[in-house]
Regions:
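Polytopic transmembrane helical bundles with strong interfacial aromatic enrichment
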Residues: 1-295
């Protein structure tokens, strides 16, 4: 394979992996939001004695939604295998190790998904399922940045570097609190599923307050990255992040004051994924060994 062809394929397969790892979060959320979490009431079978839905299941159309999401896991797995094999045959050791993680993570997700079903959609397992996906998305951003030659020789000023780390940590806190809020709210995935024994109003307020802190930090990062010539690339990413935050905040408040309709909650999940991708892109340029970009 020619060098230019290899480079192009590397970009495409790593982008496909990022899209797949992000997309499965959204489809998984749709399963929950449509009350289809137990559409296939067992695992690995869809219904006792059959890997696929069968006519006459009491779960009705929910079985097709849940089974469809399970089937998408094989697509995500196939893409992660292709990414790893390509890296193994063509790339340096460091990217080979990182490219192995989406493959392992996808397999773990399948098992965790099974545990989630077998525990009756307990919110703790649903939350773990989502947070593992968030980790895989961050890893996928890092891998794509490598294949996309997303590098810079500039070293961030210390104040910008520290600010990026703080924004990353607070952004992660926003995501975690968002999942706890979800685990305390009405969209459990099935009418019999348990919920966290928390006051939804209190946890939602805490989530909203953390979001306000996060947006304030993003505005601060916009300012300091703008006035530092060495961090213009940070300014561009932060500007995108700020726009996403505004849209995400608007959706968040509208959904709350309209009784959390599943369509708006789905859009909020998409916004959360896009927010996290932008945060992960910022983190690539920090001095943190785990987060920073590969060379």
């Amino acid at each position: 394979m020619k060098t230019t062809t290899k480079a192009k394929f590397g970009r495409r397969i790593s982008l496909a992996n990022l899209i797949a790892q992000s997309g499965i979060i959204v489809t998984g959320a749709i399963v929950r939001l449509t009350g289809s979490g137990l559409g296939c009431p067992t695992w690995p079978d869809c219904t006792p004695g059959s890997l696929i839905p069968v006519a006459g299941q009491v779960e009705g159309f929910h079985k097709y939604i849940e089974f469809g999401n399970r089937t998408l896991t094989f697509l995500v797995l196939a893409i992660s295998i292709a990414l790893f094999v390509f890296s193994l045959l063509n790339e340096k050791r460091n990217i080979i190790v990182w490219s192995f993680l989406p493959l392992i993570g996808t397999l773990l997700q399948a098992v965790l998904g099974g545990i989630t079903v077998l525990t009756g959609l307990h919110p703790a397992t649903v939350m773990a399922h989502f947070l593992l996906s968030i980790v895989l998305v961050a890893i996928s951003v890092k891998i794509y940045a490598y294949f996309n030659n997303q590098r810079t020789s500039k070293v961030l000023p210390k104040i910008v570097d520290n600010y990026v780390k703080i924004v990353t940590l607070v952004g992660l806190a926003v995501i975690v609190l968002g999942t706890i809020t979800t685990g305390s709210g009405p969209h459990s995935g099935d009418e019999i599923a348990a919920r966290f024994n928390l006051d939804i109003r209190v946890i939602a307020w805490l989530h909203a307050d953390t979001v306000l802190l996060f947006v304030g930090l993003v505005v601060g990062l916009l300012v300091i990255s703008r006035i530092n010539p060495e961090s213009k690339h940070i300014y561009k990413i932060t500007r995108t992040l700020f726009i996403i935050c505004l849209v995400q905040g608007f959706i968040g408040y509208v959904q709350w004051f309209n009784g959390l309709p599943w369509i708006l909650v789905s859009l909020h999940v998409i916004g959360a994924v896009l927010t996290w991708i932008a945060i992960a892109n910022l983190a690539l340029y920090s001095s943190n060994t785990f987060l920073k970009r590969l060379k």
